[in-house]
Every structure is written in C-alpha cells, then in structure tokens.
C-alpha cells in the first residue's frame, strides 16, 4: 500500500471525570464527548483517545459502585470501553476504594492503565503490566507512557498494599523515557502525568510543588512531545520549549484536541507541526448509544 504524503493523528484527551456519568450531573458531558469522538473518527481514522486518570472516584455514583454494589460492572469502564479509549493514566483516586477494586476495573478495561512509578516492591517492575503502550499509524510510531504524582499519593495518605510502592515520579520518568527512546525509537512521545503544573499556583509551598511536577518533568527530560497533565481541574494549553503541555479540566465538561501532522520523507515520516485546541462540548448532543449503555445504571 502506498504511503500517504502526509498523516494527521488526532489525540483527544479528557481528565478527572470522577464517575460523573449521570447526564446533567455536575456538568458532566461524557456523552457529548462520545459524540465529539465519533465525529472526529468519521473525519479521520487515526484517532488516539486518552484520559489522564481520576475517573473511578469522587462522586456518589462512584461510591455506590465501589462500596454498595461492587459486583456490578462499573459504568465508567463500560463507557470508556465503548468510546474505545486507547489508554488512561492512574491517579490516587483509583486506589480510594482499595487495590482489589481497582485491579478488577483494570481487568475489565479494554485499554491499558499506565503508570511507570507504581511498582512491585521486590522487583521494582511496573505493577499494572506495562508503563507504556505503542500506537503505530502507517509506520508512524507513537509512544504513550504514564506517570502518577508520588507527592499527590503521599499527600492523600492512601495506604499502599504490601506488594506495591510508589517510586519518585522524576526517577521513574527518567528511567522509562530513556528506555522507550532507546528501545522503541518513537516518532512522537506522549506522557500522561496525573499531577499538575505549579505556575497555576504562584504561592505553592514546597509540599504543593512536590505534588505538581510537570515543569520539572519537562525541564529535566527535554524529550517529551506532548505532556498531558491532570488533578487541578483546569483547562489549558501551553508550551515549554519543544513540549506541548495540556490539561482537560474535569468531568468531560471540556476536552483537549491535539492534531499531530507528519510529512513523508524517503523512508520515514517527519513531524511537521502540532495544532491544539480546547473544545467546549455544550454544542454537541449526547451520544444515544452511550446513554442506552448506562440506562439502567442511571436509574439505580
């Protein structure tokens, strides 16, 4: 098959949805997000859908499905599977109801949950199978690696099970990003970091700065093309040297859409430019297929 002269890859990201799947609940627009994603997939088959984490706790609905009815399949997992998410980051919220709850959610997901610094204590290998995933699009290799804020995990006082630990975010990021560049040689590297950026809080003390280490990750590594952040429930797009950094708010009220454009060389593709925009979902209708999928969940 003849290679295209140009390839555009659409990266769409959400953040901190906190199980707000009741339509009209706290401005949640996950059903409108579903419509937007469907629309973009009709326009371009090369869509990568990501979430920065924080989707399984933080609402009464989340409590119900974790504590009152843990035997039921979690509606957020059903929705994210149906929307064909490609990967999610991991936040401390995922551990709020215990490791067994989150492990079951992971097992029911048709996408990987990524964190390079949540590890087995004995081996220091990633606890959730793989810290990164590779998406190949017509010969263009996109690497996606996950990181969880160790400062946020410690601040929230979540008890880690005996068999796992949280490594320093910067230590793990250096280890795994170097490994990915040396072994996978990606054309574009995306980091999903469930933590924030300190420039949003000029009065941040040292403890808060250790929670939000996005700047340190960008400045100490310098080989990241797109950094997806979370936790702060803010919506923004910025740039630090070669790294585009974004955050997609909360509850799918908005999302961030990044267009990655490659042009063909003799035997490979070269990154041409990256476009980005914040998308307000209020103008989109709710996806009827997704509403039908959670009809009985929303009636519980």
Question: Model-found features: residue ranges?
Answer:
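Acidic, glycine-rich low-complexity/disordered segments
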Residues: 88, 298-300
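Acidic, metal/ion-coordinating pockets
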Residues: 1-289
